[in-house]
A protein has these predicted regions:
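RNase H-like (RuvC/DEDD) metal-dependent nuclease/polynucleotide-processing core
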Residues: 2-23, 28-181
Length: 181
């Protein structure tokens, strides 16, 4: 049943029950540029951001509060607009810029991209929440799930934990592959 393979809990339970080792890939940023975790949570660890977002994001009935949460995070940066930006045309989110223009990441004490994105010139910033190619919304909504799954015994999130657990969760970038897999 294909639908089951799209449910990480089922994959993890099945792998553990059958003694399998499994790698589960997620196509969104599992972290933010250096300095963000400490600024948001007081802890310089990606896991602290996952935990914080798990307490802030609501995502039920195909509705979520990602733009509200991004606006709330942006409000903790009095040095200027950002770091998050972009939202649907016609919507107003005070404190969440529509465009990247005017965001001074250096003044915020952050970088626009992670080290991982510097290796892929066409990669979008994890701060970009909306429009083609953006991954910011996927990260805001996916990281609470990563937090929940990381609490299951036998699950590790690489590279934040050693990949020697039976189930390893990792960030993947499928569009880097040119041909069929």
């Amino acid at each position: 049943d294909v639908a089951r393979w799209l449910q990480p809990d089922w994959v993890i339970d099945t792998a553990r029950a059958e003694g399998l080792r499994v790698l589960i890939g997620f196509d969104f940023a599992m972290g933010y540029p250096a300095g963000f975790a400490a600024r948001l949570t007081g802890e310089a660890r990606a896991e602290a951001v996952w935990r914080w977002l798990a307490g802030a994001i609501t995502d039920t009935d195909n509705r979520n509060n990602r733009f509200e949460v991004a606006t709330r995070i942006n409000a903790t940066f009095p040095e200027g607009p950002g770091p998050f930006w972009s939202h649907p045309t016609g919507q107003s989110w005070p404190g969440l810029p529509f465009r990247r223009a005017g965001i001074d990441y250096a003044a915020l004490g952050l970088s626009e991209t992670r080290v991982a994105e510097t290796a892929v010139p066409r990669a979008k910033s994890p701060w970009m929440l909306f429009n083609p190619g953006s991954v910011g919304s996927q990260s805001l909504l996916g990281l609470p799930m990563i937090h929940r799954l990381s609490q299951i015994p036998g699950v590790a999130v690489w590279p934040f934990a050693a990949p020697d657990s039976p189930v390893v969760l990792a960030e993947v970038y499928p569009s880097l592959l040119a041909g069929p897999v």
